[in-house]
């Protein structure tokens, strides 16, 4: 991906419609990222092994990742984890739930005074369907908290910063929770970082 002389906004517009939607999706779900240190490379190693088994390729070893840090130096290697912040996700969904509940009450009150209003009846049906879906999401979040605690690891990637480019070298993802678009959170973070730090090229070399 050529970044030279381009802004983040210009790069975002160049993405396909589906990629832009995937980025908006992870933002909607409160997916976050954080940089891992060398002592946390076991997270990448574990997720990469799971990905390799699923996609039938040979994963690199934990020693390989550590050797990269020693060979290139810590300033040239960045390992990033994306994760679903379940508390933040729950707060956002609860806010949507409360708002939708109020909207439904307002629409019902309007229809009591103005029965037969087709537009409002359609709106009520849509809001009630959304209300039910939010109820299910909130219940599901509680189930996820019981299983995972406060966060769910979604993807983990290792990048090499060298010369005029950032190279996406190793990528892994949580297939079970792919709906949250964890890999896109990492890629968009690193593309923006590459622009901020003046790199000309973002190299999608890695395996995901």
Q: What does each model-found stretch correspond to?
A:
Residues 173, 184-186, 208:
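Active/binding-pocket-proximal capping segment
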Residues 194-206:
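Conserved GNAT acetyl-CoA-binding A-motif
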Residues 142, 206-208:
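Conserved catalytic-core subdomain
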Residues 1-179:
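A conserved beta-strand-loop-helix scaffold within acyl/acetyltransferase catalytic domains
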Residues 178-192:
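Conserved acetyl-CoA-binding loop-helix of GNAT-fold acetyltransferases
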